[in-house]
Amino acid sequence: MIDKQFEKEEFKKSVKENVKFLYRKTLEEATQEQIFQAVSYTVKDVIIDNWLKSQKAYEKQDPKIVYYMSMEFLMGRALGNNLINLGAYGEVKEALEELGLDINCIEDQEPDPALGNGGLGRLAACFLDSLATLNYCAYGCGIRYRYGMFKQEIRDGYQVEAPDNWLKNGYPFELRRPEYAKEVHFGGYVRVEWDPVKNENKFIHEGYQAVKAVPYDMPITGYNNDVVNTLRIWDAEPIVDFNLDSFDKGDYHNAVEQENLARTIVEVLYPNDNHMAGKELRLKQQYFFVSASLQAAIAKYKKTHDDITKLHEKVVFQMNDTHPTVAVAELMRILIDEEGLGWDQAWDITTKCCAYTNHTIMSEALEKWPIELFSRLLPRVYQIIEEINRRFILEIQQKYPGNFEKIKKMAIIYDGQVKMAHLAIVAGYSVNGVARLHTEILKNQELKDFYEMMPEKFNNKTNGITQRRFLAHGNPLLADWVTDKIGPDWITDLSQLSKLKVYADDEKALQEFMTIKFKNKERLAKYILEHNGVEVDPHSIFDIQVKRLHEYKRQLLNILHVIYLYNQIKAHPEMDFYPRTFIFGAKASAAYARAKKIIKLINCVADVVNNDASINGKLKVVFIENYRVSNAEIIFAAADVSEQISTASKEASGTGNMKFMLNGAPTLGTMDGANVEIVQEVGEENAFIFGMSSDQIINYENNGGYDPDFIYNTDPEIRQVLMQLINGTFSSDTEMFRDIYNSLLDKRNMPRPDQYFILGDFRSYAEAQKRVEATYKDEKRWAKMALLNTACSGKFTSDRTIQEYVDDIWHLDKVIVKKN
């Protein structure tokens, strides 16, 4: 394993000893889960050697460190990924086989760490992988959620949220670090007293509730370079564990009250915020991990540096979306109240340390907090934001005298709310979007006033994915084929994939490529049969949409089109129709009623379609339960068609589109997010583009003129599909999908009916689907298209994205960890 010559016998001995010492069992007596733990601890031993070596190298070379602060880190399983990065996957597989063990069965015992939900968290995970692989010193900073967002179960077609108890057996790839615990303070009040020495007011936070933040460190291995960075996730514990006096008096509730209050902070990701208690808990979570992370970063800096005013030379805090943006004010608080700096000096440091990534143009996702809540929960931090806001308004007035509209649009505090994105933009030295189109929309639409005032801050960093997880680990058959054709350098230089273009007209290579695709489809079909009880034909077109469930992502457009196809087959049973399998995977937020109803609709349509013998299996619909990284790897490898059908202008980037492309699935999509750049790389002839442009959508939104009612009244096939939502075709309860029907047509629907232009794009989408079918029937043409998607995906590696962050924003130096 990289550091020391891998000895199979030594590895096997270590696994057996771990089983004995951990469980007092022999290997033959141990359960699969116990064997997973034993194997993981054996691998972790090697990782820890490299981890220590990396820390020594960092201490010696004193590099600038990026702290990547994110509410989510969707890591996926660690065992297989670490083995690939250590260069030991094949050897460990052989060693386990010699012990009579199957590495795939062992990997399946590992829970997906429930530290994230969607693209935001998976991007953060890919970035950590690339930072380590590219030899940069980085810490991920987040929360150690006990139950994640939720484990999705489908019961009677409905999403049911269950706790995702990923820690129930302990997690071998983490280390508790109580020696680095920090205190985080909530509530209380601020007392002001005069400091005669400094001749200024001194602010003292008193009467607060204190919570202990205890870090757990996870190793992040670089590929084939011995670098191990750290993901530090914070657990919340009470300052005093247990009130024995209360317990002895029979007051059992009070005995554990402090523990319960602390634990609540880290129970779940994104607690329901439809009520004030939920809003307060979310703000608590955000401040909790940000404050602990900043305290830890500054303590680490001060161990080897005396001058706090040079913090920005060695530290950068990258705020991943608006969740961690309270970091701006918390850093100011630490520098002023704890380090004794004046306002101007603290502001100068803060504005050189903090950078902000915007991930959305959806206004509801640009967080705003009620002043009453914020000032009560974080009184000193709120005072600092008030002062930042006061000074910023003066800047606006100087630049735009008398323009009160500018103040209204740009103020950090306005109309009873604290606007976190505005705080991040004002204080951050860099503001980046995550795809070219997204960044242009930010500059010209959503954040136009800020861009006009401070254009130098704005830049684009198109997202990327790590090929080490989503090809090397997720699709080993294709990975081996690629290596056989062009060598292994693609694992750290994805631009090498362009060398595959020479095989685009090579019939033998195309046949090999499609044989691998078919084997991966068989693997997914087996998974579906085991988990859904539905038999799907791997010879059919696997048309897949897997992503967070949101109306703008338009899973509804997809399932309405499935209904349309079903109607076509029923009306014309003799028609030449190539068999299709439509596969969905998505979690809906627990409080998002319409999104959950769309899941129910998909499952109701599946029940009808899959059980209709008259269509001879030409059409199948599958909803994969509990979509997550571990089943995503199986899904991406098996896809024929990548559904990327968001309303143009709404998707910031997307990264699922890149994972599908890397695995040889052409994009069926709108010109939105990173789809635009995918088409630029692969050519429009190797994708299936449909729908209105972002300019057309924005024009309709700003000026009106879109009339879904007209479409409904003039297109009988669309009308039939919509009527089937409410006439009992898919549910005996004709009101079951009334809300979905009304959302598309009822003029009382706010802000307008069919907010995401589903009916407006329906015909264009249906035509694109016809092109998919026609192309797929031409086997050679389809194979060439699929191969070219893989060959042209080199741009979309997170290695490229991270290098752009390093060059343009972070300015880090590489650190070399010497191999033994």
What do the predicted segments below correspond to?
Residues 1-820:
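A conserved ligand/cofactor-binding region detector
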